[in-house]
């Protein structure tokens, strides 16, 4: 029986991908089942910012996640990929503030809190769909009905629940402590949002007069204090020296007079001081420096805050004790000349006034790192403010033990050390932010300033027995974004309700994320989850069993991708293509630093002179997987993307070749499998084994490589060719066997590759399924190929490998001797082993067909060969008689190269064996193997040299 079949010449991703995805989604293939007893598999996506768009890092991580999800779905697991977006407090608020400033010339204060928040919700509704549409374009098999947003009602309830419970347990408190303060945005920000920039600054050396006629060891009546922050000196409450610094031993415990403020402050000893820095004397300003804050706590120093929230000098200093409460009885007047000055104007005036008083000793150039807010773009100030904190140490201890005990594995393992180093030195976490957009802190204040914490105002009144006449005002602050995203794995599954989803899918299986948020997000998820989610035995649950840490996607030069560098690549542009003009507009439009536009445009024109061609989603996904070597940063490579687009085309063309073959016979009847049929099935079985083993170790690169190698090099380049003689000259049983092998291996190959390249595999599979008698609707729901223990055929593998070497040797002789592929050749074998002679005897017809040979002959031991071109395959010598077609000069040149190759190998092994250290350390078996190789190369060299002499004598 033969089948007529039509198939397009080329695979057109743009015509197929979106329609296929829509069908998958509408058919409900992405949804988990309701079966609570089925083995489950769950991944919670790291939620992207709701106002953003996907970048290459998202595409990279999501490709890996979808590969795992699709694989596990095909394995029969009840699979949930939980998706959603993050409200991203500060980022989203800034986007909308910039938008209303540009379009309406208004600020958020013109709107007021409630109206401005409504404006953000409008923006979220408008832009929030962008990310989910882009994720669909990537082929992500997500149950969209379960999509969550970190400010959904359900998640907001979970946030309030966690806050209230932690407060009731004494683990959340309000206090005045030092935070990173952004004076432009008027909010505390996390360390993650601080960018330390290299700066050419100064180190000022000021003289602080000693009080009460004290003198230094060398007779001076002042100490020289080195500082990079003159503007904060009005808040100094001590100067410090190292306890073992002999220069200042006699002065410890005495005082200096703080210039300009005319206030006595103590000289203290603390090991924090670096004796080599400046003069070895530093000013201590606990209200304006994180290190000084710790020194101040150790020595019970007052904290004198001299800056407003705008970073101007205050009219009156705020004086706070180490307990965070106002401190009475300590005088710290700010001189009138400095009140209201902007911080850097105050710096200039203070330096000038020191100089006028003769107290400026010297100014030295000094390189330093200045902390900037990554969004406000101005230097941040360590600032004493009232904030809410989580006391995380008790939570951290449990989270550390979970990783120590192996309940959570990091891949690669070295990231455990990074996790431990952070967690073992953990500080209380500032969770309040002075923003309008976010989860408002569930705390209320009465007129006297008493604080009441509860889930809502109604609960406050009942919990604290407050009369309805008592006026309450909710805290204005919102929670750090990381607080709500720390609940992500369980809040999205319905917690605090004990839902069936929570029972079925928690703990999740793997988290795929970047190393830069291990502390800010991963660690906090572990702490919160283990504190609040328990199994049926009351044991704390982990949020995930494995953390797979990816590297960054960089550009081709290894630079980090960023808008300011103009080197950002949009994954959708890799899929659909983009013109040079549109790419230039995308990279240079709406820039924060327009002066960089011309430089960026020039670099873009050079790199993408023709714009970017369309490659389709599968090529992008396959490239990302192939580049995913464990934990390393990845340099993006457009050539690899082009290469994998060609790979997709190769798979399409091979499928077309198989399915449109008019001689394909899938009828019932006798079958006779050839050596090639047995070989390709064994090779496929090995590929399945490699894929499964690699995926279990999160080696996505090895998975991609296994599929590429099998598809391109074994199936397309060899097996399809090996079947051509069968279809041309085989009997009915052989043709049936080749036909069955072709379509069944192709169908299984599509299933194997589907998790990585879902669109093209589904499109081809829909055409293949009828050939193999499958009536199912989608490849997604088919079982993933298993390793079949009986499916290995080492004998067939060895025989085909030998035949391939012979065929390649003959083809090389043709190429090197410029012999037309169509010209029939004779092939002689000399020194052929009994084992290979048997293969040759059985497979002569195949060899003749594949290598275009007229005659094949094995020479007797002492038989003289005619003048011939020779190649070695193992120990066997292949000879193609030269009569009538040899080019003497070309053949001598070829043999010279062969002689050099063999001489180099002989020399290399001789050097190895004459190396005493190698011989002393290497096992006997290794040395014996090297000697065996040496003898083989020496023998081969002699044969080629003989051949050279024979041709030279012509």
Curated annotation (Swiss-Prot):
It comes from the Bacteria. Transmembrane segments: none annotated. Its main location: cytoplasm. It catalyses: tRNA(Val) + L-valine + ATP = L-valyl-tRNA(Val) + AMP + diphosphate. GO terms for cellular component: cytosol. ValRS has two distinct active sites: one for aminoacylation and one for editing. The misactivated threonine is translocated from the active site to the editing site. The C-terminal coiled-coil domain is crucial for aminoacylation activity. Catalyzes the attachment of valine to tRNA(Val). As ValRS can inadvertently accommodate and process structurally similar amino acids such as threonine, to avoid such errors, it has a 'posttransfer' editing activity that hydrolyzes mischarged Thr-tRNA(Val) in a tRNA-dependent manner. This is Valine--tRNA ligase. It comes from Haemophilus influenzae (strain ATCC 51907 / DSM 11121 / KW20 / Rd). The gene is valS.
């Amino acid at each position: 029986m033969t089948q007529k079949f039509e198939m397009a010449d080329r695979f057109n991703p743009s015509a197929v991908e979106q329609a296929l995805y829509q069908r998958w989604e509408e058919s409900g293939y992405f949804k988990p089942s309701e079966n609570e007893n089925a083995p489950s598999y769950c991944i919670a996506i790291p939620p992207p910012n709701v106002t953003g768009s996907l970048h290459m890092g998202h595409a990279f991580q999501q490709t890996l996640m979808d590969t795992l999800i699709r694989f596990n779905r095909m394995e029969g697991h009840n699979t949930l990929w939980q998706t959603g977006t993050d409200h991203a407090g500060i980022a989203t608020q800034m986007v909308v503030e910039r938008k209303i400033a540009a379009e309406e010339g208004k600020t958020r204060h013109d709107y007021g809190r409630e109206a401005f928040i409504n404006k953000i919700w409008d923006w979220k509704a408008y832009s929030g769909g962008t990310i989910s549409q882009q994720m669909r374009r990537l082929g992500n098999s997500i149950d969209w009905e379960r999509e969550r947003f970190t400010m959904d009602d359900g998640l907001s309830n979970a946030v309030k629940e966690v806050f209230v419970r932690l407060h009731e347990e004494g683990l959340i408190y309000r206090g005045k402590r030092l935070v990173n303060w952004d004076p432009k945005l008027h909010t505390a920000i996390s360390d993650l949002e601080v960018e330390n920039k290299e700066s050419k600054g100064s180190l000022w050396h000021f003289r602080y007069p000693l009080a009460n006629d004290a003198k230094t060891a060398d007779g001076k009546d002042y100490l020289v204090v080195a500082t990079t922050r003159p503007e904060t000196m009005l808040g100094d409450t001590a100067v410090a020296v190292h306890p073992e610094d002999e220069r200042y031993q006699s002065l410890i415990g005495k005082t200096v007079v703080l210039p300009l403020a005319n206030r006595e402050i103590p000289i203290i000893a603390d090991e924090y001081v670096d004796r080599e820095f400046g003069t070895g004397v530093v000013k201590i300003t606990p209200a304006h420096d994180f290190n000084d804050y710790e020194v101040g706590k150790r020595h019970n120093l007052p904290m004198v805050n001299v800056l407003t929230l705008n970073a101007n000098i205050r009219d009156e200093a705020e004086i706070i004790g180490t307990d965070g409460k106002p401190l009475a009885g300590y005088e710290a007047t700010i001189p009138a000349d400095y009140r209201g000055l902007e911080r850097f104007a105050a710096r200039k005036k203070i330096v000038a006034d020191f100089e006028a008083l003769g107290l400026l000793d010297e100014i030295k150039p000094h390189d330093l790192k200045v902390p900037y807010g990554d969004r406000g773009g101005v230097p941040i100030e360590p600032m004493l403010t009232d904030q809410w904190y989580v006391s995380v140490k008790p939570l951290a201890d449990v989270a550390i033990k979970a990783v120590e005990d192996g309940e959570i594995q990091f891949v690669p393992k070295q990231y455990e050390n990074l996790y431990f180093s952070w967690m073992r030195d953990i500080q209380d976490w500032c969770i309040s932010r002075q923003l309008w957009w976010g989860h408002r802190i569930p705390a209320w204040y009465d007129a006297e300033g008493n604080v009441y914490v509860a889930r809502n105002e109604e609960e406050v009144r009942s919990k604290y027995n407050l009369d309805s006449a008592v006026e309450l005002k909710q805290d204005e602050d919102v929670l750090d974004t990381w607080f709500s995203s720390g609940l992500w794995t369980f809040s999205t599954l319905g917690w605090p309700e004990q839902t069936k989803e929570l029972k079925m899918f928690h703990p999740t299986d793997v988290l795929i994320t970047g190393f830069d948020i291990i502390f800010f997000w991963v660690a906090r998820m572990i702490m919160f989850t283990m504190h609040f989610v328990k199994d049926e035995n009351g044991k704390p649950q982990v949020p995930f069993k494995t953390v797979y840490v990816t590297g960054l996607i960089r550009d081709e030069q290894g630079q980090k991708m960023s808008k300011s560098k103009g080197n950002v690549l949009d994954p959708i542009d890799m899929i659909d293509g983009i013109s040079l003009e549109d790419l230039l507009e995308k990279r240079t439009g709406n820039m924060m630093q327009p002066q960089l536009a011309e430089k960026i445009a020039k670099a873009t024109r050079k790199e993408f002179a023709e714009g970017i061609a369309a490659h389709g989603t599968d090529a992008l996904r396959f490239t990302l997987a192939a580049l995913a070597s464990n934990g390393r940063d990845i340099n993006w490579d457009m050539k690899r993307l082009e290469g994998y687009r060609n790979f997709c085309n190769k798979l399409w063309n091979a499928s077309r070749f198989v399915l449109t073959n008019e001689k394909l016979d899938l009828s019932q009847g006798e079958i006779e499998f050839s050596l090639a049929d047995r070989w390709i099935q064994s090779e496929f079985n090995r590929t399945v084994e490699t894929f499964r083993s690699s995926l279990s170790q999160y080696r996505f690169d090895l998975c991609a490589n296994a599929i590429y190698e099998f598809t391109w090099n074994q199936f397309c380049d060899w097996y399809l060719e090996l079947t051509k003689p069968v279809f041309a000259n085989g009997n009915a049983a052989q043709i049936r066997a080749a036909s069955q092998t072709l379509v069944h291996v192709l169908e299984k190959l599509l299933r194997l590759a589907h998790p990585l390249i879902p669109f093209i595999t589904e499109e081809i599979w829909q055409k293949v399924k009828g050939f193999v008698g499958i009536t199912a609707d989608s490849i997604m729901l088919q079982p993933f190929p298993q390793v079949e223990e009986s499916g290995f055929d080492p004998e067939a593998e060895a025989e085909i490998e030998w035949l391939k070497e012979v065929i390649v040797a003959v083809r090389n002789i043709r190429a090197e001797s410029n012999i037309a592929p169509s010209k029939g050749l004779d092939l002689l074998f000399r020194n052929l082993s009994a084992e290979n002679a048997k293969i040759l005897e059985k497979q002569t017809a195949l060899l003749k067909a594949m290598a275009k040979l007229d005659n094949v002959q094995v020479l007797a031991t002492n038989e003289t060969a005619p003048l011939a071109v020779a190649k070695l395959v193992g120990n066997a010598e292949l000879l193609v008689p030269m009569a009538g077609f040899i080019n003497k000069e070309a053949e001598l040149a070829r043999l010279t190269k062969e002689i050099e190759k063999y001489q180099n190998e002989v020399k290399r092994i001789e050097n190895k064996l004459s190396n005493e250290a190698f011989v002393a350390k290497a096992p006997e078996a290794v040395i014996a193997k090297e000697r065996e190789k040496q003898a083989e190369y020496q023998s081969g060299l002699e044969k080629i040299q003989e051949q050279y002499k024979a041709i030279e004598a012509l």
